[in-house]
C-alpha cells in the first residue's frame, strides 16, 4: 500500500476480484504492484524544454508561476494563455533553457497546490497529430470520488512514462467518475489495461480500456448497426406505468430496468426508457415496436441517445436540408448590395418581379431594424435570375447604383477567396517583357528587379491585386510600360543634386482627397510619379537601394491606346448584358470604347488620360456616368484638377499652363 500523498488523497488501493469456488463472496487479494514516486527520465531522442501547466486558478499570473518554478530550474519565459478579454483560460506554458531543467521541474512541482488548487504539469507537445492520435491513450471509468489527478498519476506511473493524466471534473470541481491517461508508448498502455482492468480501486471495480472517440463508440467495426441496449419510448398513454412497460417489452428479452418519466406532480410525461441486457433484444424491440398503436397513441421506439448525439444528428439533418435547398436554387439566387435605405422586402420583390417569378426576397437588417445595404432575391429558375442580373446590375436605385451577383455559400466564397489570395501571394516565375505577337501586353508588375547592368526582369502576377494586369488601356501590344507610382521612404535626409526620371508628386491635402474620390483608392503618402522607363537613367530613384525597386503601383490608366474609331454607343441595358458575360479584359475595353466619345465632348485635349482615370472606378459607377451627363462632367472636371496638380511646372506633356 503506498503512503498518503501531499494532497491528503492516497493512491488508489488496488485488489483483484477473484471469485471463490466454494463461496459466493469474493476474496480481495492484494496485488503486488510497486507504486514508487513518479520518476521521469528525460528522453533525449525528443528533447523538450517546454512544460504545460493546467488546472490553474483564474487568479494565477505569470509572476506566480515564475516565482514557483525559478527555485527548481532556470526559467526562460512564462505565458498564461488568455481569451480576448484577458481572462485566464486555466493553462500556461513555461519555457526552460534545456530539457533536463524541464523534466526536473515537472518531477518536483507536479500537482503542487497554487491558490489551493493542484496544478497539473506535463510536457508541452506542439504536434497536434501526436496529441490527437489517441496512441497510448486509455480510458478509466467507475472511479471513486476521492481519486484525483495525482492519485491517478501515481497509480499508473509504474507502467511507463505518462504524457497526460486527467480526472474529469464538473463545474464544482467534483469528480465525474472517469479519467484518461496517455502513455508515451502503446506497450505501456496495453500493460496497464491488462493488469488493472476489472480491479478494485478504493473498493470500486474499475474499467480500463483503450480510448475510443465518441463518433466511433456507437458503431462496432464489424456491424453496420449501432450497438445499444437502452431503448427510448415516447407517445406512451398516461395510464401506462413501469409494470405495464416491462410487460409490453419483456417478450423481446431480459429487461434490466424500465422507467416512465414523470413530472413533479407524479404524472406521466408520456415517455420512458427500457434497458435490455443484450443488444439483440434491444434491436428487436426497436424493429418490431416502432410505429405500433398502443391504445389511441402510436408509439415511437428508438435507440436512446445522449443530448450531444441528438444535437449532432439534428445539425447534420438541417445542414443537409440547407444544402439541398441551395442546390435546387443554384444559379437562381441573386445577391444584391449597395441597396438604398428606402428599399424593403416588398419593394425589392416589386422591382424584380418583371423579370420572372420571385420565390423570395429579403433585405438584411441590423438589430435596430435598419437596412444593412444588401439582400437576396430568389427566382424559380436560373434563366430568370440571369435576365434580372443582366438588366438590373449597375442600375440606379434611389441614389445608389445596384450591384448584383449570383449568391454563393459562405464556404464556397471563402474557398474561392483563399485560392485567389494564395495565387496573389505566390511568387511567379521571372519573365521579361516578351509577349505573343498581337496579344495583349501583360500589366505592370508589382516588383521590378534591376541588376547591375540595368536589365529588367518582371515577374508575372495574377489578376486582382489593385488593377487588371492582363489588359490596361494605355498599353498597346508591343509597347513598354506606362506610368507608375513608386513608393519611397517619407522620412529621409534631404538629397542634393537633381533627381532623374521622376515627376514632382502632389504635396497638398486637396490633391489626395481628389485622387481618393476619383479612383476609390487610398494611395500611401510618399508616392512619386515615374513616367515610363525612359526618363532618367533606368528610371531609378536615388533614394531606393540600387538593384531593387519597391512595389510599382499603376497610375490612372492611360486610354490613349483605345481605338479612335467611334464605336456605336449602346443602350445601357444592352451594354450591361454584354458586360455580364465578358472577361475582365473585354469588359474594360468595352467600357473604354463607350466612355471615350462621351469624355471627348467635355475634354477633347486630354480625353485619353481622363478616360483612363475614369476606368479605374467601379463598373456600376461608370455606367452611372454614362447615364448622367452632369455626373460625367463633374468627374471629368475632378480628373483634370488631379492632372493639373500632379504636373511639374517644367513638364509640358499634359499641355497645362501652371498659371491656369
Swiss-Prot record:
Pfam families hit by this protein: MLLE, RRM_1
Cross-referenced InterPro entries: Nucleotide-bd_a/b_plait_sf (IPR012677), PABP-dom (IPR036053), PABP_1234 (IPR006515), PABP_HYD_C (IPR002004), RBD_domain_sf (IPR035979), RRM2_I_PABPs (IPR045305), RRM_dom (IPR000504), RRM_dom_euk (IPR003954)
Protein name listed in UniProt: Polyadenylate-binding protein 3
PANTHER family, per the entry: RNA BINDING PROTEIN (PTHR24012)
UniProt-recorded Gene Ontology molecular function terms: RNA binding
Signal peptide: none
Domain RRM: 49-126, 136-213, 229-306, 332-409
Subcellular location: Cytoplasm; Nucleus
Record family assignment: Belongs to the polyadenylate-binding protein type-1 family.
Swiss-Prot/TrEMBL keywords: Cytoplasm, Nonsense-mediated mRNA decay, Nucleus, Repeat, RNA-binding, Translation regulation
Keyword RNA-binding: yes
Known tissue expression: Expressed predominantly in immature flowers. Detected in tapetum and pollen. Strongly expressed in immatures siliques.
Superkingdom, taxonomy of origin: Eukaryota
Residue span(s) of domain PABC: 571-648
A GO CC term assigned to this protein in UniProt: cytoplasm
Note: A.thaliana contains 8 PABP genes.
Amino acid at each position: 500500500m503506498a503512503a498518503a500523498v501531499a494532497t491528503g488523497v492516497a493512491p488508489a488501493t488496488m485488489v483483484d476480484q477473484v471469485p471463490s469456488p466454494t463461496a459466493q463472496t469474493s476474496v480481495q487479494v492484494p496485488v503486488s504492484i510497486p507504486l514508487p514516486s513518479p520518476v521521469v527520465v528525460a528522453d533525449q531522442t525528443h528533447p523538450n524544454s517546454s512544460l504545460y501547466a493546467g488546472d490553474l486558478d483564474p487568479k494565477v499570473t505569470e509572476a506566480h508561476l515564475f516565482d514557483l518554478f525559478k527555485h527548481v530550474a532556470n526559467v526562460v519565459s512564462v505565458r498564461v494563455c488568455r481569451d480576448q478579454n484577458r481572462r485566464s483560460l486555466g493553462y500556461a506554458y513555461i519555457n526552460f533553457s534545456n530539457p533536463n531543467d524541464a523534466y526536473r521541474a515537472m518531477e518536483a512541482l507536479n500537482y503542487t497546490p497554487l491558490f489551493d488548487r493542484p496544478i497539473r504539469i506535463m510536457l508541452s507537445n506542439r504536434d497536434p497529430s501526436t496529441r490527437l492520435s489517441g496512441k497510448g491513450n486509455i480510458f478509466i471509468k467507475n472511479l471513486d470520488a476521492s481519486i484525483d489527478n495525482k492519485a491517478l498519476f501515481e497509480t499508473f506511473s509504474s507502467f511507463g512514462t505518462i504524457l497526460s493524466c486527467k480526472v474529469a471534473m464538473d463545474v464544482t470541481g467534483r469528480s465525474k467518475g472517469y479519467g484518461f491517461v496517455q502513455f508515451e508508448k502503446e506497450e505501456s498502455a496495453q500493460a496497464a489495461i491488462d493488469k488493472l482492468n476489472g480491479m478494485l480501486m478504493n473498493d470500486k471495480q474499475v474499467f480500463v480500456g483503450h480510448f475510443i472517440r465518441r463518433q466511433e463508440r456507437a458503431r462496432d467495426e464489424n456491424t453496420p448497426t449501432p450497438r445499444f441496449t437502452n431503448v427510448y419510448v415516447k407517445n406512451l398513454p398516461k395510464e401506462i406505468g413501469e409494470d405495464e412497460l416491462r410487460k409490453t417489452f419483456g417478450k423481446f428479452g431480459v429487461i434490466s430496468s424500465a422507467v416512465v418519466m414523470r413530472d413533479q406532480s407524479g404524472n406521466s410525461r408520456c415517455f420512458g426508457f427500457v434497458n435490455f441486457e443484450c443488444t439483440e433484444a434491444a434491436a428487436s424491440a426497436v424493429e418490431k415496436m416502432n410505429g405500433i398503436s398502443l391504445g389511441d397513441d402510436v408509439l415511437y421506439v428508438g435507440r436512446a441517445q445522449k443530448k450531444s448525439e441528438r444535437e449532432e444528428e439534428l445539425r447534420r439533418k438541417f445542414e443537409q436540408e440547407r444544402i439541398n435547398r441551395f442546390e435546387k436554387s443554384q444559379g437562381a439566387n441573386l445577391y444584391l448590395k449597395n441597396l438604398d435605405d428606402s428599399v424593403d422586402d416588398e419593394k425589392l420583390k416589386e422591382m424584380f418581379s418583371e423579370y420572372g417569378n420571385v420565390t423570395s426576397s429579403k433585405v438584411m437588417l441590423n438589430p435596430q431594424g435598419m437596412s444593412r445595404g444588401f439582400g437576396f432575391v430568389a427566382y424559380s429558375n436560373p434563366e430568370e435570375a440571369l435576365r434580372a442580373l443582366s438588366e438590373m446590375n449597375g442600375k440606379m436605385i434611389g441614389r445608389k447604383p445596384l450591384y448584383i451577383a449570383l449568391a454563393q455559400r459562405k464556404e464556397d466564397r471563402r474557398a474561392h477567396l483563399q485560392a485567389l489570395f494564395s495565387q496573389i501571394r505566390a511568387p511567379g516565375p521571372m519573365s521579361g517583357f516578351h509577349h505573343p505577337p498581337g496579344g495583349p501586353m501583360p500589366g505592370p508588375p508589382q516588383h521590378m528587379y534591376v541588376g547591375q547592368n540595368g536589365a529588367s526582369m518582371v515577374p508575372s502576377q495574377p489578376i486582382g491585386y489593385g488593377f487588371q494586369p492582363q489588359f490596361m488601356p494605355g498599353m498597346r501590344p508591343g509597347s513598354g510600360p506606362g506610368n507608375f507610382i513608386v513608393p519611397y521612404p517619407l522620412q529621409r535626409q534631404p538629397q542634393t543634386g537633381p533627381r532623374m526620371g521622376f515627376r514632382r508628386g502632389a504635396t497638398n491635402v486637396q490633391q489626395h482627397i481628389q485622387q481618393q474620390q476619383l479612383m476609390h483608392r487610398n494611395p500611401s503618402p510618399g508616392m512619386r510619379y515615374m513616367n515610363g522607363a525612359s526618363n532618367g537613367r533606368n528610371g531609378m530613384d536615388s533614394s531606393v537601394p540600387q538593384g531593387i525597386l519597391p512595389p510599382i503601383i499603376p497610375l490612372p490608366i492611360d486610354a490613349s491606346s483605345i481605338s479612335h474609331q467611334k464605336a456605336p454607343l449602346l443602350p445601357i441595358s444592352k451594354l450591361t448584358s454584354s458586360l455580364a458575360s465578358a472577361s475582365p479584359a473585354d469588359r474594360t475595353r468595352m467600357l473604354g470604347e463607350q466612355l471615350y466619345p462621351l469624355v471627348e465632348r467635355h475634354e477633347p485635349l486630354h480625353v485619353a488620360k481622363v478616360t483612363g482615370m475614369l476606368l479605374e472606378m467601379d463598373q456600376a459607377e461608370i455606367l452611372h456616368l454614362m447615364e448622367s451627363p452632369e455626373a460625367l462632367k463633374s468627374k471629368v472636371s475632378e480628373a483634370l484638377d488631379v492632372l493639373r496638380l500632379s504636373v511639374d511646372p517644367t513638364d509640358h506633356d499634359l499641355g497645362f499652363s501652371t498659371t491656369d
